[in-house]
């Protein structure tokens, strides 16, 4: 979810800068053997290519979906970053760096603003549970009283970095009832409902900011040793929220789910990034920037002004001067800057080989019904056992040099697959250009076999985007199409993509929506931060614009019956990172969906498909004992069709029998 890579220590920042401007990059050759991927559409024919730029008047292209509404963020929030979404009842709650924005989406064609509550922080990601709303705060501008302006003091009890708890019984007037402070803030968080504990909910906190001073929050410590119980690294913080008194929410454990992980290499810059870095370096050199060699890689790096300015000030003071540094002062710094950089790199703490160089999760998706979670943890993808909420256990960990930043995770409905997204470039860079590798900044799909993750394939947005559009895999959710694994996903300015990953080795796009760049002349942030299916609609948080609502339309990939069956699934609330198990109520559209899928597979004779459909239609027109008899007869006749797809035929049979009614 970040619009930039997470903040790190000063040495890490310099190292990151070194990578960003490196001219020669060594890329570890340990990428997976990449399976065949579907070719990208021809740019000459894909309607998403070449769209007109504009903030509120950009060109648009859609395929197999229809946009039903587009609403602009309200004054005071427009121009500030829109972030993640959560849903409760008829409301969509949209995070924004200025505070939560609440929309009434009961009419998907006309979202209505309910309230926009000022409470600045980043990222202000949102979750809900009953009458409670939770909101992440990580940056130093957050205050415990929700007032703007931040906190000037380096140590202050007014600073808020953690998870806020609101009472939204009156959703028009959210009431702040608790600030749960954490050592690294809360970049994102996940609400976990334990089926065995009805008195509490739990929150897994993913913090990626620098560690706070223990003078500001007791117990915070920066020790890198994984076995140090006081360390704030290599931990996720677990908050317990007592439902009888949510104001007493508190951190109850800091769990280490990283122990024993190895450092893993990732790919370096793409060819386009190398070219851009070379140009940037040339411009910086011509402008008189301070440049040194990275002592680890030998690459040139531009020293950031925030490091140079204090050094120049020191030289000026040392000679008894004041004001702006002169040419001699600059020359003095140029003479020693390489030695300073060498010492900086040498003095930086180096974790041992047994400790991951990524010491945090970006996002954790929990699946309470199955007692498992998927941790997207920057350098690794994790499979966790969460049957005991305060003691998560790592079952497996995977790494991939094609992945730069393990960002988010989604299970399929039966929990046999797990998809991870890679936010290569941190979300603020163009990573869907023609020359960008299809396995970089993509999704990686794994099957879960004996509690282990087995890689199957990658999926990446197939449409090429421009160099002025931030684009990479981001947040999404399952669409409840029965019998299939179908997901809608945001790709920032790449728009939204709906794809089928039922066949884990061959995922395929089946619907999309995209806009042109926010600005055709420069990189300007925008696009879909997250898009989730909620009660019949796909609702997207548009970073720069507001809120979009869309719906699927029938196509060769999705039938009207499948869409109708999906719309029978209704939730009272939804946190996409707290993945609910999808269950379909009995309906004729459900049965018809399975018949459509058998036809699409092509292994049942068309005349037989027609017979099945005719029998379903006839049964639908009857009632009582007559309907029950018709459904029983058709169900028994389907046994002869199991040779095509036994699992699908059994689902159809069950759907038919579930439609039987009790006859008095």
Locate the predicted segments by residue.
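A short, amphipathic alpha-helical segment
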Residues: 1, 548, 552, 657-664
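N-terminal secretory signal peptides that target proteins for export/translocation
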Residues: 1-15
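Intrinsically disordered, low-complexity segments enriched in Ser/Pro/Gly/Ala and basic residues
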Residues: 8-11, 25, 496
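Generic alpha-helix initiation/capping and coil-helix boundary signal
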Residues: 12-15, 19, 366, 584, ...
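Bacterial N-terminal signal peptides
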Residues: 17-28
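Residue-level signal for mature regions of secreted extracellular proteins and peptides
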Residues: 23-24, 58, 637
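Feature marking well-ordered beta-strand scaffolds used for ligand recognition
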Residues: 30-598
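Soluble extracellular-acting proteins and domains
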Residues: 561-664
């Amino acid at each position: 979810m970040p619009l930039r890579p997470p903040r790190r220590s000063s040495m890490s920042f310099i190292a990151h800068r070194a990578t960003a401007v490196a001219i020669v990059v060594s890329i570890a050759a340990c990428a997976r053997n990449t399976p065949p991927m579907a070719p990208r559409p021809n740019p000459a024919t894909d309607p998403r290519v070449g769209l007109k730029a504009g903030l509120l008047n950009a060109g648009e292209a859609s395929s197999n979906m229809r946009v039903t509404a587009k609403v602009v963020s309200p004054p005071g929030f427009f121009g500030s970053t829109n972030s993640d979404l959560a849903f409760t009842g008829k409301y969509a709650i949209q995070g924004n760096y200025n505070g939560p924005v609440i929309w009434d989406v009961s009419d998907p064609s006309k979202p209505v603003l309910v309230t926009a509550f000022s409470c600045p922080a980043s990222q202000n990601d949102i979750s809900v549970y009953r009458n409670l709303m939770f909101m992440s705060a990580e940056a130093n501008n957050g205050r415990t009283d929700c007032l703007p302006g931040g906190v000037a003091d380096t140590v202050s009890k007014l600073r808020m970095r953690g998870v806020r708890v609101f009472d939204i019984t009156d959703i028009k007037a959210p009431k702040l009832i608790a600030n749960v402070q954490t050592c690294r803030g809360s970049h994102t968080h996940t609400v976990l409902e334990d089926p065995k504990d009805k008195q509490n909910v739990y929150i897994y906190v993913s913090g990626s900011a620098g560690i706070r001073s223990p003078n500001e929050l007791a117990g915070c410590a920066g020790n890198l040793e994984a076995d140090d119980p006081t360390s704030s690294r290599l931990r996720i913080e677990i908050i317990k929220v007592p439902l009888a008194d949510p104001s007493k929410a508190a951190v109850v454990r800091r769990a280490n789910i990283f122990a024993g992980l190895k450092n893993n290499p990732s790919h370096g810059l793409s060819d386009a990034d190398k070219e851009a870095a070379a140009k940037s370096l040339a411009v910086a050199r011509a402008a008189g920037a301070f440049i040194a060699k990275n002592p680890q890689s030998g690459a040139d790096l531009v020293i950031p002004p925030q490091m140079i300015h204090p050094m120049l000030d020191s030289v000026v003071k040392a000679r008894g001067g004041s004001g702006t540094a002169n040419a001699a002062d600059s020359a003095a710094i140029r003479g020693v800057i390489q030695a300073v950089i060498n010492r900086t790199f040498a003095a930086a703490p180096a974790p041992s080989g047994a400790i991951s160089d990524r010491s945090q999760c970006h996002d954790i998706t929990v699946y309470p019904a199955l007692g498992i979670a998927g941790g997207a943890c920057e350098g690794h993808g994790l499979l966790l056992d969460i049957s005991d909420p305060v003691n998560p256990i790592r079952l497996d960990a995977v790494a991939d040099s094609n992945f730069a930043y393990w960002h988010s995770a989604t299970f399929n409905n039966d929990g046999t697959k797990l998809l991870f997204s890679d936010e290569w470039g941190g979300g603020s860079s163009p990573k869907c250009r023609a020359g960008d590798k299809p396995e970089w900044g993509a999704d990686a799909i794994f099957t879960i076999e004996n509690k282990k993750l087995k890689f199957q394939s990658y999926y990446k947005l197939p449409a090429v985007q421009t160099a002025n559009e931030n684009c990479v895999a981001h947040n999404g959710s399952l669409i409840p199409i029965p019998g299939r694994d179908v997901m809608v996903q945001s790709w920032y300015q790449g728009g939204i993509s709906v794809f089928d990953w039922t066949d884990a080795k061959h995922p395929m796009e089946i619907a999309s929506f995209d806009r042109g760049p926010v600005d055709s002349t420069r990189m300007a942030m925008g696009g879909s931060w997250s898009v989730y299916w909620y009660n019949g609609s796909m609702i997207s948080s548009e970073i720069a614009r507001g809120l979009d609502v869309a719906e699927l339309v029938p196509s060769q990939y999705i039938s009207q019956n499948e869409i109708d069956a999906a719309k029978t699934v209704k939730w009272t609330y939804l946190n996409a990172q707290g993945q609910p198990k999808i269950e379909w109520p009995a309906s004729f559209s459900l049965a018809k969906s399975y018949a459509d899928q058998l036809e699409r597979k092509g292994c049942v004779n068309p005349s037989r498909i027609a017979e099945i459909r005719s029998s379903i239609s006839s049964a639908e027109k009857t009632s009582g004992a007559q309907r029950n008899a018709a459904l029983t007869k058709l169900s028994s006749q389907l046994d002869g069709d199991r040779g095509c797809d036994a699992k699908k035929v059994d689902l159809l049979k069950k759907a038919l029998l579930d439609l039987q009614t009790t006859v008095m």
